[in-house]
Swiss-Prot record:
SUPFAM superfamilies: beta-beta-alpha zinc fingers, POZ domain. This is Zinc finger and BTB domain-containing protein 7A. Pfam families: BTB, zf-C2H2. SMART domains: BTB, ZnF_C2H2. Sumoylated. Undergoes sumoylation with SUMO1 that may regulate its transcriptional activity. It comes from Homo sapiens.
Amino acid sequence: MAGGVDGPIGIPFPDHSSDILSGLNEQRTQGLLCDVVILVEGREFPTHRSVLAACSQYFKKLFTSGAVVDQQNVYEIDFVSAEALTALMDFAYTATLTVSTANVGDILSAARLLEIPAVSHVCADLLDRQILAADAGADAGQLDLVDQIDQRNLLRAKEYLEFFQSNPMNSLPPAAAAAAASFPWSAFGASDDDLDATKEAVAAAVAAVAAGDCNGLDFYGPGPPAERPPTGDGDEGDSNPGLWPERDEDAPTGGLFPPPVAPPAATQNGHYGRGGEEEAASLSEAAPEPGDSPGFLSGAAEGEDGDGPDVDGLAASTLLQQMMSSVGRAGAAAGDSDEESRADDKGVMDYYLKYFSGAHDGDVYPAWSQKVEKKIRAKAFQKCPICEKVIQGAGKLPRHIRTHTGEKPYECNICKVRFTRQDKLKVHMRKHTGEKPYLCQQCGAAFAHNYDLKNHMRVHTGLRPYQCDSCCKTFVRSDHLHRHLKKDGCNGVPSRRGRKPRVRGGAPDPSPGATATPGAPAQPSSPDARRNGQEKHFKDEDEDEDVASPDGLGRLNVAGAGGGGDSGGGPGAATDGNFTAGLA
């Protein structure tokens, strides 16, 4: 081959994924680079968030919920057993599930609670088929107790997840935070009275937030000024100007968490992106315009013009806090007839929706959420601006437009023939390289195109899928049927005897209707019969057959040899030409 094909080449490594998983499992067993600890029944399970989130939908929602999910490093759960969690951890890191009759029930329950469908389906199948049978001696009372435990564990799992999804303690005033802190979720297995007290504390915290007692800036503790993230004015050390709000010295203090040290690539929602000045510039451009922002709480900072607050520099947690306050005011004033106030609240909600669904998507949402968007894009419909034809599939519209413009961007390096599609060029290159990748498994014949192999296989199978609706004649290939209908013409009379092999160099077989007189010259054929015979002479062997005359008393036989003139009569004079059998 004279030259290589332009463009990137994808080289797969089949063992890469298993090697990566093996390396992660080695890190887990040695306690290296683990960023979260799961505490169950007093046992600690150091692990990686990303691995658990990739296997379990429950852990994915747990690790991505709340404003400070990155600061939560220990999760204590009591709705699964330590033995079941050990088996699920091994499955996540080794792609192998180890079950026994003793623990298959616990593993099934844990897999359902943690939303691991692959494991739950396998365990359920093992129990249904009695491959791993449960305890057959269990009575009805024990089964009811197991069901009650499962229902209780399901309720606890939901409440545990809802707590971190709402995460009210992260934005409480100091008094409410102190009250709620006395009921940590680390004591999740406490009595029902403790759980009720925790719910009351959470409800009081939400009520305080809705009443506007929290301005959203208490999320960060006071801390020394040196520990605060720089709010710089464009200095070199300020890698993210405008991302952190300037703290008012008179603002309330005593937040739950110490002020985080600003990372080089911290984004407005607390996650980490590319970092640097380019990231800050992109975030500043993507944020909504200050003029579009509505009025906020009295605790918000005023803008430069004094007409409205400047919220573009606030963190996402602060904006979310203010949105919750606006929702609380909207609920309190539901019976108010002042349309102007309701319009202001609607403007607040519109602004927040615009902010959180803005151009931050590429940095906020992880790759797993973009897969769904990619699938939707692949099924999208696009209309051609030239012929208005609807094209299904993303990326196919430019290829269709080339049929209008005549553009052929793909050129053969050898013969300089150009093509509109790259796959057509790839097939064309087989003419130069002699490559025939399609091999017949029965006779070993090789072909350059898959459709040639498909047609060849019908020689072995005897399949003739294309049939004429008028004469019921069948064909191996569709182009043969089209030629039969267009070029040859179909008389609509079905054949009585079916197919007949081509006669090569000999006299045609005598038919019952033939009345040629021995020794007499053959009657010259009519022009129509001569033309029909010449066309049939060049037809493929599998397409030749006798065509009955309309009255069924005579037949037209076509002999081989290429002569076009008439020959002498007699029994042995049928070596050249076309002969017409006489009609009785």
